[in-house]
């Protein structure tokens, strides 16, 4: 009876975890980290509500790096050196936007947008870009579709892509990195976007520590659920062992019965 109850509790807990995981995966919230080169762009995004609005509003060339199935920040290691990522997240990010759904750029921008789908990273950015003429394109979108990337190679690849695009755009380039999941929160607790002043103060006073603050704040729902499940399973094990240790096992039924009246021959 007790084992039946424990088993039912285990199944219920497992079902809840699976339901949470499916729900989180279906929503696919995303966060965008945006770097502006032109101060004038701040005047055009005062009423933005999504990353797509930012892309539609800025008047400079835009490079968008979208990760469909890969949470970039969840995979960045604090103790590793990534030249581009460290510089970008610590010093270059001007605006952070949290979206309730994956990035969806307006179809009206298709004539001025070039899209590259990146499953496996090419050997170099030139292998991907040099065959295309991007002179008439204001938006270049890189869609990363894999769920795993070598971060050092990814760091080098994105840096090379931006160097190529900056040459084309005359160093006037807005950079958008869109990743699944967690969004940066500013000092006021606003997770939709941070103001330029807040981020500027953060960068000037903390410098390199800004990157560590961002990465060290990562705490995914999946990891939290794993810890909860582990705690519940440990509790179930302790209860089961306690119940077994309290069993009073009687061996009398196993002993061979003897008839004291029967005489020995």
UniProtKB/Swiss-Prot annotation:
<feature type="glycosylation site" description="N-linked (GlcNAc...) asparagine">
    <location>
        <position position="69"/>
    </location>
</feature>
<dbReference type="GO" id="GO:0000329">
    <property type="term" value="C:fungal-type vacuole membrane"/>
</dbReference>
<dbReference type="GO" id="GO:0000220">
    <property type="term" value="C:vacuolar proton-transporting V-type ATPase, V0 domain"/>
</dbReference>
<feature type="short sequence motif" description="ER retention motif">
    <location>
        <begin position="262"/>
        <end position="265"/>
    </location>
</feature>
<keyword id="KW-0926">Vacuole</keyword>
<keyword id="KW-0812">Transmembrane</keyword>
<dbReference type="InterPro" id="IPR046756">
    <property type="entry name" value="VAS1/VOA1_TM"/>
</dbReference>
<protein>
    <recommendedName>
        <fullName>V0 assembly protein 1</fullName>
    </recommendedName>
</protein>
<feature type="glycosylation site" description="N-linked (GlcNAc...) asparagine">
    <location>
        <position position="172"/>
    </location>
</feature>
<comment type="function">
    <text>Accessory component of the V0 complex of vacuolar(H+)-ATPase (V-ATPase), a multisubunit enzyme composed of a peripheral complex (V1) that hydrolyzes ATP and a membrane integral complex (V0) that translocates protons. V-ATPase is responsible for acidifying and maintaining the pH of intracellular compartments. Functions with VMA21 in assembly of the V0 complex.</text>
</comment>
<comment type="subunit">
    <text>V-ATPase is a heteromultimeric enzyme composed of a peripheral catalytic V1 complex (components A to H) attached to an integral membrane V0 proton pore complex (components: a, c, c', c'', d, e, f and VOA1). Interacts with VMA21. Associates with the assembling V0 complex.</text>
</comment>
<dbReference type="GO" id="GO:0016471">
    <property type="term" value="C:vacuolar proton-transporting V-type ATPase complex"/>
</dbReference>
<dbReference type="GO" id="GO:0000139">
    <property type="term" value="C:Golgi membrane"/>
</dbReference>
<feature type="topological domain" description="Cytoplasmic">
    <location>
        <begin position="245"/>
        <end position="265"/>
    </location>
</feature>
<keyword id="KW-0256">Endoplasmic reticulum</keyword>
<dbReference type="GO" id="GO:0048388">
    <property type="term" value="P:endosomal lumen acidification"/>
</dbReference>
<keyword id="KW-1133">Transmembrane helix</keyword>
<dbReference type="GO" id="GO:0065003">
    <property type="term" value="P:protein-containing complex assembly"/>
</dbReference>
<feature type="topological domain" description="Vacuolar">
    <location>
        <begin position="25"/>
        <end position="223"/>
    </location>
</feature>
<keyword id="KW-0472">Membrane</keyword>
<feature type="signal peptide">
    <location>
        <begin position="1"/>
        <end position="24"/>
    </location>
</feature>
<dbReference type="GO" id="GO:0005789">
    <property type="term" value="C:endoplasmic reticulum membrane"/>
</dbReference>
<dbReference type="Pfam" id="PF20520">
    <property type="entry name" value="Ac45-VOA1_TM"/>
</dbReference>
<dbReference type="GO" id="GO:0061795">
    <property type="term" value="P:Golgi lumen acidification"/>
</dbReference>
<feature type="transmembrane region" description="Helical">
    <location>
        <begin position="224"/>
        <end position="244"/>
    </location>
</feature>
<dbReference type="GO" id="GO:0033176">
    <property type="term" value="C:proton-transporting V-type ATPase complex"/>
</dbReference>
<dbReference type="GO" id="GO:0007035">
    <property type="term" value="P:vacuolar acidification"/>
</dbReference>
<keyword id="KW-0325">Glycoprotein</keyword>
<dbReference type="GO" id="GO:0046961">
    <property type="term" value="F:proton-transporting ATPase activity, rotational mechanism"/>
</dbReference>
<comment type="similarity">
    <text>Belongs to the VOA1 family.</text>
</comment>
<dbReference type="GO" id="GO:1902600">
    <property type="term" value="P:proton transmembrane transport"/>
</dbReference>
<keyword id="KW-0732">Signal</keyword>
<feature type="glycosylation site" description="N-linked (GlcNAc...) asparagine">
    <location>
        <position position="104"/>
    </location>
</feature>
């Amino acid at each position: 009876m007790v084992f039946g109850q424990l088993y039912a509790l285990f199944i219920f807990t497992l079902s809840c975890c699976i339901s949470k995981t499916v729900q989180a995966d279906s929503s696919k919230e995303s966060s965008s980290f945006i770097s502006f080169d032109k101060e004038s762009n701040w005047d055009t995004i005062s009423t933005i509500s999504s990353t797509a609005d930012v892309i539609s509003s800025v008047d400079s060339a835009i490079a968008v790096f979208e990760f469909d199935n890969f949470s970039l920040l969840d995979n960045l290691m604090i103790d590793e050196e990534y030249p581009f990522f460290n510089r970008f997240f610590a010093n270059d990010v001007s605006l952070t936007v949290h979206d309730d759904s994956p990035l969806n750029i307006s179809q009206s921008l298709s004539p001025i947008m070039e899209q590259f789908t990146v499953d496996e990273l090419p050997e170099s950015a030139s292998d991907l870009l040099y065959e295309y003429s991007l002179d008439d394109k204001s938006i270049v979108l890189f869609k990363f579709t894999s769920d795993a990337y070598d971060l050092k190679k990814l760091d080098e690849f994105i840096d090379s892509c931006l160097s190529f695009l900056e040459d084309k755009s005359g160093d006037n380039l807005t950079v958008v990195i869109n990743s699944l999941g967690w969004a940066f929160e500013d000092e006021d607790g606003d997770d939709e976007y941070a103001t330029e002043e807040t981020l500027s103060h953060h960068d000037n006073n903390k410098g390199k520590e800004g990157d560590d603050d961002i990465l060290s704040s990562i705490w995914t729902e999946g990891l939290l659920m794993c810890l909860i499940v582990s705690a519940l399973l440990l509790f179930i094990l302790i209860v089961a062992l306690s119940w077994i240790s309290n069993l009073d096992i009687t061996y009398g039924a196993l002993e061979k019965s003897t008839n004291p009246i029967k005489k020995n021959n």
